[in-house]
C-alpha cells in the first residue's frame, strides 16, 4: 500500500513539473539565468530535455550580443529567475 502511495506521489509531482515546463515554453517566459562563473544572462525559455540536463532558450543576451537560439547545460546553472502570471482558477 505504501509503495503505491509513493508511486502516486511521484506521478503527481512529475505531472506538475511537466505542466510547469509546458506553461513556460508556451508563454515564452523571459528568464534570467545565473551561472557558476557569477554571470547572469537573459533569455526566453524554450524547452528542457527529459533528463533536465539541457535548457533550450531563444534571444540569449550575452556579452558578445544576442544569440537567436542556444542550449545551456543545466550543470552550469546556479539558478533561474522568472515571473509567472497566475491564470484564473489556478492555485
UniProtKB/Swiss-Prot annotation:
Gene knockout outcome: Inviable cell population.
GO MF, one example: RNA binding
Ranges for domain Sm: 18-86
GO biological process, alphabetically ordered: spliceosomal snRNP assembly
Parts forming coiled coils: none
Entry's Gene Ontology cellular component terms: nucleus; Sm-like protein family complex; SMN complex
Family: Belongs to the gemin-7 family.
Keywords noted in UniProt: mRNA processing, mRNA splicing
Quaternary structure and interacting proteins, as annotated: Part of the core SMN complex at least composed of smn1, yip11/gem2, gem6, gem7 and gem8. Interacts with gem6; the interaction is direct. Interacts with gem8; the interaction is direct.
Organism: Schizosaccharomyces pombe (strain 972 / ATCC 24843)
Domain of life where this protein originates: Eukaryota
Name of the molecule in the record: Gem-associated protein 7 homolog
Amino acid at each position: 500500500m505504501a509503495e503505491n502511495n509513493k508511486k502516486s506521489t511521484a506521478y503527481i509531482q512529475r505531472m506538475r513539473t511537466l505542466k510547469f515546463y509546458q506553461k513556460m515554453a508556451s508563454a515564452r517566459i523571459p528568464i534570467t539565468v545565473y551561472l557558476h562563473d557569477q554571470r547572469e544572462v537573459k533569455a526566453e525559455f524554450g524547452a528542457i530535455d527529459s533528463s533536465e540536463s539541457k535548457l533550450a532558450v531563444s534571444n540569449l543576451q550575452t556579452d558578445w550580443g544576442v544569440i537567436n537560439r542556444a542550449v545551456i547545460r543545466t550543470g552550469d546553472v546556479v539558478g533561474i529567475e522568472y515571473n509567472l502570471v497566475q491564470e484564473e482558477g489556478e492555485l
